[in-house]
């Protein structure tokens, strides 16, 4: 996976640069890149894009025909480049890196909050306010429920994880007692 991320990075950076230069703006490009990634992740599309009977022009034409949003010329050129370099199937990874670049540019980050119980909007806002101070970023929360945590929350922001769940505390206690 690390190798694919390394291969995808220059494409994500180039796409991000093009999006910053485009008057349509980052938000519309982020939506478009998300749609491109969804289409590229589809199993039938992946199979079609590896069909040896199709040449590069046909692959690009088939792929662009599956996109519902209007494609600016820069996006068409990007798709052509990916097809020529046999990198079209990296679009989901490129999209993830694009979102990371966009978030870094905007000074924001995705906060994946996993809770044992459903959190009210007020609880999420209070938690996000405290986490924004801790991480120094504007956070976009994504809340999921996992009853196996027993209680508490686990928060992932980028590669940092803050786990205050009862399950994690019990695991630490077990490890301490076993040592």
Curated annotation (Swiss-Prot):
Query: Gene Ontology terms, cellular component aspect?
Result: plasma membrane; proton-transporting ATP synthase complex
Indicate the transmembrane segments per the record: none
One GO MF term: proton-transporting ATP synthase activity, rotational mechanism
- Subcellular location field: Cell inner membrane
> Which InterPro entries does the record associate with it?
ATP_synth_OSCP/delta_N_sf, ATPase_OSCP/dsu
Cystine bridges: none
Q: Which residues form a coiled coil?
A: none
Topology versus the membrane, per the UniProt entry? Peripheral membrane protein
Alphabetical list of SUPFAM superfamilies matching this protein: N-terminal domain of the delta subunit of the F1F0-ATP synthase
**Superkingdom to which the source organism belongs:** Bacteria
Keyword terms of this UniProt record: ATP synthesis, Cell inner membrane, Cell membrane, CF(1), Hydrogen ion transport, Ion transport, Membrane, Transport
Instruction: Provide the assembly information.
Output: F-type ATPases have 2 components, F(1) - the catalytic core - and F(0) - the membrane proton channel. F(1) has five subunits: alpha(3), beta(3), gamma(1), delta(1), epsilon(1). F(0) has three main subunits: a(1), b(2) and c(10-14). The alpha and beta chains form an alternating ring which encloses part of the gamma chain. F(1) is attached to F(0) by a central stalk formed by the gamma and epsilon chains, while a peripheral stalk is formed by the delta and b chains.
The function of this protein is: F(1)F(0) ATP synthase produces ATP from ADP in the presence of a proton or sodium gradient. F-type ATPases consist of two structural domains, F(1) containing the extramembraneous catalytic core and F(0) containing the membrane proton channel, linked together by a central stalk and a peripheral stalk. During catalysis, ATP synthesis in the catalytic domain of F(1) is coupled via a rotary mechanism of the central stalk subunits to proton translocation.
What family, per the record?
Answer: Belongs to the ATPase delta chain family.
Q: What is this protein called?
A: ATP synthase subunit delta
Q: Which organism is it from?
A: Bordetella avium (strain 197N)
Its organism's taxonomic lineage begins at:
Bacteria, Pseudomonadati, Pseudomonadota, Betaproteobacteria, Burkholderiales
């Amino acid at each position: 996976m690390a190798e694919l991320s390394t291969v995808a990075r220059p494409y994500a950076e180039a796409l991000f640069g093009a999006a910053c230069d485009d008057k349509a703006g980052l938000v519309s490009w982020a939506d478009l890149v998300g749609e491109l990634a969804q289409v590229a992740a589809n199993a039938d599309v992946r199979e079609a894009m590896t069909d040896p009977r199709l040449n590069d022009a046909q692959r690009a034409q088939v792929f662009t025909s599956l996109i519902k949003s209007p494609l600016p010329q820069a996006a068409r050129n990007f798709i052509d480049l990916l097809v020529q370099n046999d990198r079209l199937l990296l679009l989901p990874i490129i999209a993830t890196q694009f979102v990371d670049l966009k978030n870094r540019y905007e000074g924001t980050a995705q906060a994946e909050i996993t809770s044992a119980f459903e959190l009210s909007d007020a609880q999420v806002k209070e938690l996000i306010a405290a986490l924004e101070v801790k991480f120094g970023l504007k956070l976009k929360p994504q809340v999921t429920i996992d009853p196996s945590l027993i209680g508490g929350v686990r928060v992932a922001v980028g590669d940092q994880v803050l786990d205050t769940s009862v399950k994690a505390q019990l695991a630490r206690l077990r490890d301490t007692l076993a040592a």
